[in-house]
Amino acid sequence: MSHVPLDPETARKVTSSLNYRFEIGGEPLVIAIAQDAENGDVLMTAFANEEAVYRTLTTGYAHYWSTSRREVWKKGEESGHVQRVVEVRVDCDKDAVLYVVEQEGGACHTGYRSCFYRRVTRDGSFEVVMDRVFNPDEVYR
């Protein structure tokens, strides 16, 4: 059963209680992790400021803070590969959030379902362990 979206007042109560201890470019942030609701796979990790968490809680779609563009962005707003949030969890220090999501398409901008598509091998190289689910050259024009 989905626990989001929340009403605005409840969402503000949640966002104001988090510990935005990480700072990039002067922006207070929490770590945001997306996990596949169906199989538990970790899909991606990013950052979220207070507004990104608020939008996630009130819309039911994952929002993050872009450290390069310095703005809140909805996952999939360009690609269509949105993350519908079914649950939000908070870690023990309240400085990280876990978005349990139903992923549409791929989570990674490189075309993979997960950003964790490579594993470290015995010789220290990286081995691709997943197939691409979309062609990024066709999606991001």
UniProtKB/Swiss-Prot annotation:
One of its GO terms (biological process) is L-histidine biosynthetic process. GO terms for cellular component: cytoplasm. It is found in: Cytoplasm. Its cofactor is Mg(2+); Zn(2+). Pathway: Amino-acid biosynthesis; L-histidine biosynthesis; L-histidine from 5-phospho-alpha-D-ribose 1-diphosphate: step 3/9. Zn(2+) binds at C92, C108, C115. Pfam families: PRA-CH. Disulfide bonds: none annotated. Binds 1 Mg(2+) ion per subunit. Binds 1 zinc ion per subunit. GO terms for molecular function: magnesium ion binding; phosphoribosyl-AMP cyclohydrolase activity; zinc ion binding. Belongs to the PRA-CH family. NCBIfam families: PRK00051.1. Catalyzes the hydrolysis of the adenine ring of phosphoribosyl-AMP. This is Phosphoribosyl-AMP cyclohydrolase. It comes from Methanopyrus kandleri (strain AV19 / DSM 6324 / JCM 9639 / NBRC 100938).
